[in-house]
A protein has these predicted regions:
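Long, compositionally biased low-complexity segments
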Residues: 70-440
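Alpha-helical assembly-interface signal, strongest on the long, hydrophobic N-terminal helix that forms
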Residues: 2-81
Length: 440
């Protein structure tokens, strides 16, 4: 029995030339999109590899600098070293070169200044006491006034010392004190003053530095100086601090004086404090009628044997200046002992009697040293003097101390870089891009 065969209907297949062309174009478009996306993805991967490698290279910051001074730097970072480290961290099959770089010493230490201020703002929350704020506000005018007062005192001492009798004459005593080493007058134990010193000629503030090419940066506001000083007082020690041995014992004094030795810097700071105190003390004497009367009485006594008319008033003025100078020496003594001295004196905080001025600096001196709880201590006066210094000098001298303590070259420390990278992708496609990294 024959099986019946079922016929399957056949269809005729055909496509127009237009449709075929359209289909080819669609395939080409999809292929181009896929290729473009693939190339862009490869670019993104290369750029991500570069960013990651650059961040990893700068993650090799100097740990000792961070631990001691809370400053981030990449030490000894030449393009050769940077290229090697970036290859190690995966930025391979590319060429890199530095477009711009910034070093810690650039722009007179502005890079260091920015990091120090940022640290103080984030972690210290420094706020000046009323006494320190008053000192910072009036210290410039005090120093200007002191220059005039000092000139007046020198003139009057030169004029009147020869004509007045030596016996019972405080002006002769003050003339002798001004020619005496200040440290021996204000320190209870001059032999215990540190004699440590450094060689300043090879330090950043004096030598020719390697310079980056990032260019100038925007300077901070006036309030940032308070934060810089807060950073300094936390990371650098002064006479009244006790820490492990460093290149210099009196680091804050070096920031103010800039001399190679501790002794020279301490003497310079004592002179500056003496200047501020003398102007303030003289200003107070001009308001105290009782003390002016005392000076006038002594002036009459000293001038009783002279026949020069009008000299009594001149001698009185000289005695007031000399008295202010003697009181200022006592003030500095009090500060070096760790006690406090008020910015503005009163009759209750005045320490040196005019009758005892002649004995100052001798074994017979009689001085009532007063610790004023509401005043400023030595650190407070140093902080006020630091506020008067320009930030460039403070920054560069801070870098001097960092180099001396850590034995590194701060102008070889990189803090910011912009690199240009060139990558060759498949089919000869090239990609050039830049990457920037900065410690923040």
């Amino acid at each position: 029995m024959k099986k019946s065969q079922k016929k399957v209907p056949a269809f005729k297949g055909e496509i127009t030339a237009f449709l075929a062309l359209l289909f080819v174009l669609m395939i080409s478009l999809v292929g181009a999109l896929i290729e473009s996306a693939s190339i862009q993805m490869t670019k993104n991967i290369k750029r991500a590899d570069t960013v990651l490698a650059l961040e990893s290279a700068f993650a090799e910051y100097d740990k000792e600098m961070l631990e001691e001074y809370d400053i981030f730097v990449r030490k000894g970072c030449s393009i050769e070293v940077l290229r090697q480290r970036m290859d190690y961290y995966g930025a391979t099959n590319m060429t890199h070169h530095i477009i711009r770089e910034e070093r810690l010493t650039d722009n007179h230490g502005h890079t260091f200044y920015e990091q120090a201020v940022r640290y103080a703002k984030d972690w210290l929350g420094m706020e000046a006491s009323p006494e320190e704020a008053e000192f910072a506000l009036y210290s410039d005018s005090y120093l200007e006034e002191e220059e005039l007062v000092h000139m007046d005192l020198e003139e009057l001492l030169a004029q009147e010392e020869a004509s007045l009798p030596d016996e019972g004459n405080p002006l002769s005593t003050v003339s002798h004190l001004k020619n005496t080493n200040l440290i021996t007058l204000v320190s209870a134990n001059p032999e215990e003053i540190s004699n440590q010193s450094i060689t300043t000629e090879t330090l950043p503030s004096n030598r020719e530095l390697q310079v980056g090419n990032w260019g100038s940066r925007q300077t901070g506001g006036a309030a940032d100086k308070f934060f810089l000083v807060a950073y300094i007082t936390e990371h650098f020690r002064c006479l009244t601090d006790t820490e492990d041995s460093r290149a210099l014992c009196y680091e804050q004094e070096y920031l103010l004086g800039g001399y190679p030795s501790d002794r020279e810097n301490l003497e310079k700071v004592c002179e500056q404090i003496l200047s501020v105190r003398m102007a303030a003390n003289y200003a107070y004497l001009l308001t105290d009628t009782a003390k002016q009367a005392e000076a006038e009485a002594l002036s009459l006594t000293l001038c009783s044997m002279l026949t020069v008319p009008g000299i009594t008033e001149v001698v009185k003025h000289a005695l007031l200046l000399a008295w202010a100078y003697g009181e200022s020496i006592v003030d500095v003594r009090v500060l070096l002992k760790g006690n406090k001295v008020p910015a503005i004196k009163t009759s209750g905080t005045w320490q040196l009697q005019l009758a005892n001025l002649i004995k100052l600096g001798t074994d017979e001196e009689v001085v009532s040293e007063i610790d004023a709880p509401g005043g400023l201590d030595y650190q407070g006066y140093v902080r006020g003097l630091l506020l008067m210094k320009d930030k460039e000098r403070l920054s560069m001298r801070s870098l001097d101390l960092i180099e001396s303590n850590l034995q590194i070259k701060t102008d070889e420390c990189m803090t910011k870089v912009e690199i240009e990278s060139k990558a060759v992708l498949r089919r000869g496609v090239k990609d050039t891009f830049s990457t920037t990294y900065e410690y923040k």
